[in-house]
Amino acid sequence: MVSSKLSFVATAVAALAPLASAFDASSRSNLAIYWGQGPNQLRLSHFCQETSLDIINIGFINYFPDMSPGHWPGSNFGNQCDGSVYVTNDGVVTKLLSGCHQIMEDIPICQAAGKKVLLSIGGAYPPDQSILSEDSAVAFATFLWGAFGPVAEGWEGPRPFGDVVVDGFDFDIEHNGGFGYATMVNTFRQYFNQVPERKFYLSAAPQCIIPDAQLSDAIFNAAFDFIWIQYYNTAACSAKSFIDTSLGTFNFDAWVTVLKASASKDAKLYVGLPASETAANQGYYLTPDEVESLVSTYMDRYPDTFGGIMLWEATASENNQIDGAPYADHMKDILLHCDPSPPVTSSSAVPSSTPVTTPSPSSSAVPSSTPAVSETPSPSSSAVPSSTPVASSTPVVPGTSASSSPVSSSSAIAPSTPVVPGTSTPSSTPVASSTPVVPGTSASSSPVSSSSAVASSTPVVPGTSVPSSTPAIPGGSSSSSEAVASSTPLVTLTLTVSPTPAPSSSESSSTDLSSSTQTDVGTAPSQPAGPSTTATATTSSSSSSTDESSTTVGSGNGNGSGSTTTTAATDSITAAPTATSSATATGATSEPVTITTIIVTSYIDICPTGFTTVTTTYTTTYCPGTNTATATATVTNPPSGPGGAGSQTTAPTVPEGWTTTVTVCTQCAAKPTTVTLTLPVTETGSTSTDAVPAPPAATGEGSNPTQPSGASPTGGNGSFSEEPVPPPAVTQVSTSTEIVTLVRPTSSRPLILGTGTVHPSSTLAVKPSAKPSGQNSGSSSHVPIPPSYTQEAVSPLSTGAASRVTGLGHGLVLTVLTLSAFFVL
């Protein structure tokens, strides 16, 4: 499994190699963008294809050790991880995500395209972010360097992105003053100096008011490379006031003066802007024409200080299409047009054999002068390796909508990039799977369809993304749907989506959500000996409606305040089996035909720890009245949605030999839940668990600061005015250990659906969470031990997401009680 992922990344990097561009930190026309918190956001690799972007900040490390379980930092990358976290041997469930293999795969692709990827610390949620002591600041920086920096021989702590190395760290601090951040920056600098062969960067995102309550102290007392000022959501100094001076005073000049008198005097100053009208409070968005006027003025006035534009955020830009191009493309065009000496694109190519998944301190994964990324998909004439196109339905949480996502694991192209490959002949048994649906949502099931017969010579490959049904979502959505087609399917998928409810602007109220049904029909031509037979697999999944949603929303505004709204949990679940069949005709053409049908079925059952999905296979034989038959399940109880008859597509839901039962499950959700199950007469469910070791906490204890943080800096008296505490050498790590368990999220843990590619599988297994059960090795030392395997074996499904909405600083955490399902390859 790991080798296939390495091959995937290597192929993708090789595809980008011919057109990569070199990064120039001294340029005045760079474009930086935040990614990781967008609603329904696409994978990072999608944005790596955009030549307009130079720096991508991944957000966020949003839980700080002094305030986080186990004294570990915690992370949130929206819908891009599978929800797995590290658990200490004391049973403390940390907030550090461990199942982020999509990001782990995509960062090297960005770096191969000449982009710098920084890990952002902070965000608007939770509002208790703070550092309590100098020692804690040093420990925080040390932990992040060990976990996300170059792989060090002595480091035995967690590596959430595997051996992938970020290009630096960004500080987007929104709360509780600036104590300790200068110490963190100076500690990072000491670590950077230990790896002189590779360049690392530090950036900060203060709000525009001078002094910024959180970051002015760090900017004055520690050296940053980039300062991108949030010129939005603050009326007194926003970029909009450059256009309309009656609104306030655009203070770029004042910030230049501040920088020249600080330790960050050589930093490049960026203008931070919202990437769409909905990415900030009303009235702060600038049109491209307005931006061009601002950029031309200040790039010309401060050619040595002006660095470019920062955008919040990538998904907002992607959705803000102007003349067929995202907002970011227009910003890059403006920068290049205004720059009297724009960067020159290099013609050198990145060698296709360059290893990019495991960059190390001693060598850069990608040469610094690499050509630019191409946004144009190109046809491929080579046959795609034999693989079955897989589409799996995913569990749905209240207030979100899931749609089918046909994905092929052999794709080397990022989502939404169609590729026309040559013919391929995968071979496997048709399988269709479906997972439980939580009321109040709409869900679809997608067949895993293929045929043992050879497909026709002209395969059909969809070139556009699959439409998704989007019900009303209080407070926004944090799930998405993508379609990637890069292997030759043996089936033609026809997707039908029922009416789409309108989205709701309500953020905290309970909302009636109508059910919708999406039906996927897969057909595969086959040519068996004897009579012609067509195998058809049809699946459908439906959900009931509910007037309750279960969300916990943490919000913050530009001034750093936050609020939380909680509504009731859902109380009923309906699960139905899905089945596919392959039919084989026997007998001569002129004689009656006997059809043997092998049916592979997945159904939902309840085990002691929650839901489980069981896959079973059985064979039936029958004699139709003609020489041609279609092997489909019998519709014995067609569903009827809330909209009345005809509101849903008829599909087999209770085949012969099955029975429907209603029961109350006490372990399936936060409160007793009424569950409708469709089960075989004699089959029972099974469960499985997995547990792997993971590391404990980085310590951060210490006394509270004796001086207020975030005050206007005077002289050299800042949070790091004394001699910095030297960072501990990684070669002196103790050999004593403690065992930690990697835990899967359960229905009692915050969870939001994710997206991205789903790896092919012939079975679907729901794994209950492993209880915190780490054991002490007998040592008093706290040395983290990495997991015994990476999260690559788990297909990305979900995580807690933090969506940025109107009026916020950077980020909003939306947590939803739901179930988690993991596809095991």
Curated annotation (Swiss-Prot):
A lipid is attached at residue 800 (GPI-anchor amidated glycine). Residues 338-568, 680-736, 750-792 are annotated as: Disordered. Residues 1-22 form the signal peptide. One of its GO terms (biological process) is polysaccharide catabolic process. The cyclic peptide natural product argifin acts as a specific inhibitor. The keyword Secreted applies. Keywords: Carbohydrate metabolism, Cell membrane, Cell wall, Chitin degradation, Chitin-binding, Glycoprotein, Glycosidase, GPI-anchor, Hydrolase, Lipoprotein, Membrane, Polysaccharide degradation, Secreted, Signal. GO terms for cellular component: extracellular region; plasma membrane; side of membrane. The active site is at residue 174. Transmembrane segments: none annotated. Glycans are attached at residues 559, 717. One of its GO terms (molecular function) is chitin binding. Residues 701-712, 772-792 have a biased composition (Polar residues). Residues 801-825 form a propeptide. Its main location: membrane. CDD domains: GH18_hevamine_XipI_class_III. Belongs to the glycosyl hydrolase 18 family. Chitinase class III subfamily. GPI-anchored chitinase involved in the degradation of chitin, a component of the cell walls of fungi and exoskeletal elements of some animals (including worms and arthropods). Required to reshape the cell wall at the sites where cell wall remodeling and/or cell wall maturation actively take place such as sites of conidia formation. This is Endochitinase A1. It comes from Aspergillus fumigatus. The lineage of its organism: Eukaryota, Fungi, Dikarya, Ascomycota, Pezizomycotina. The gene is chiA1.
